[in-house]
Every structure is written in structure tokens, then in C-alpha cells.
Amino acid sequence: MAVRVKICGITRVDDLHAACDAGADALGFVFYEKSPRHLTLDAAAALLREVPPFVQTVGLFVDANPAFVDSVLRAVPLDLLQFHGDEKPADCARHGRPWIKAIRVRADTDLLKCAADFAAASGLLLDAYVPGVPGGTGARFDWRLIPPRLPQRVILSGGLTPDNVADAVRRVRPWAVDVSSGVEAAKGIKDAQKIARFISQAKAS
């Protein structure tokens, strides 16, 4: 079965169309003010009106106030929530939507414990640990740190590009891959050719 691909950090309608036309399975929209890919509610709602059928929409949050998450959900019809901070399982589950939990992986991260702690998650998104930055860094972690029989679905992220995603898929065999900076021309601005090549390389592996 072909790996699924999420293009994260969508800020422009042209980038949304480029991702969907290239075969993206999911699109990520960032609701974190410190990110250069952050969206207002109005901007996000306008973008989601352009999403075609059968493409999943994912909202990314970092230690957000629950009331803020609820306000986003009232304005923006997201399919899946992605929590990228220090949220506890109860924080993630309280909104009544499917969710995934990002884990910033370093050498001493116990991923089996993370999988047990977040057993109710639809999957674990594994990203590189960079001090003070919750994600979107373009940094890669050592894939050998991923246990071979992790009970959760693995969404591999962190430092993926069109040049290394095929190798990543062959070595890790993740449920999905997630990319943001690896397909950008500048922060928040995607490169349509990079998107197309990334998806082609990921799904051919």
C-alpha cells in the first residue's frame, strides 16, 4: 500500500491546489502564532473552501488553550487535530475529533512509552527535537530510534525532502510522511515542483 502524504503549512490557495493536484492525501494548516505559516481563522476558512473531496484537512496546534481550539473548530471544518506541544492525552481528546500527537525525538525518547501514553491517538507524528522550536525546522532525527514494532501508526516527519523521502519510506515503512519546509521556496511559500516530486518519490517507494 502506498504511503500517505501530508503537505503541512499551507498558506496560499495556489499551494493548496498544487498539493492536491500532485496527489496529497492531507493538508496541514497551522494555528500557532509563532510560526511563519500561521493562519488567521478567516484565511484558514477561505483555504478550506478550496479543498477537494477526499483530501483530509489537519489543524496543527501547540499548547493551545482549549477555548482557542474550540473557536477554530467552530470556524474551520477540520477533519483531524495535530498536537505539537506538551499536551497530555486528555488535552488532545477533549475536542471530540480524531487526533494525532507529535513526538520530538531525541536519543533518550522512549517511543514505546509515548505510544502507550497516547494510545487513543490515530497516530504518532515523529519529528526531530530542536530546542525551543516545536516543528517545521527541516531537521532530521536518527530513524534507527524508531522501534520496529511500534503499536501506533507512524507519521514520519523532520527533514524530509524530495531527495530523501524515498529512502525514508523504504527504511522506516511509515503509515504516512509529513513535509513542510522540505517543499518550500521560502517560509510559508511552497514550491509546486518540489511538492510534485516529493509526492511522486514517496508513493513510488
Swiss-Prot record:
GO aspect biological process, one term: L-tryptophan biosynthetic process
Coiled coil: none
Gene name in the database record: trpF
UniProt EC number: 5.3.1.24
A GO molecular-function descriptor: phosphoribosylanthranilate isomerase activity
InterPro entries, A to Z: Aldolase_TIM (IPR013785), PRAI_dom (IPR001240), RibuloseP-bd_barrel (IPR011060), TrpF_fam (IPR044643)
The name this protein goes by in its record: N-(5'-phosphoribosyl)anthranilate isomerase
Family statement: Belongs to the TrpF family.
Keywords annotated in UniProt: Amino-acid biosynthesis, Aromatic amino acid biosynthesis, Isomerase, Tryptophan biosynthesis
Database matches in PANTHER family: N-(5'-PHOSPHORIBOSYL)ANTHRANILATE ISOMERASE
Pathway this chain belongs to: Amino-acid biosynthesis; L-tryptophan biosynthesis; L-tryptophan from chorismate: step 3/5
Superkingdom per UniProt: Bacteria
One protein family per Pfam: PRAI
Species annotation: Thiobacillus denitrificans (strain ATCC 25259 / T1)
Swiss-Prot/TrEMBL catalytic activity: N-(5-phospho-beta-D-ribosyl)anthranilate = 1-(2-carboxyphenylamino)-1-deoxy-D-ribulose 5-phosphate
Keyword field contains Isomerase: yes
Entry keyword Amino-acid biosynthesis: yes
UniProt-listed SUPFAM superfamilies: Ribulose-phoshate binding barrel
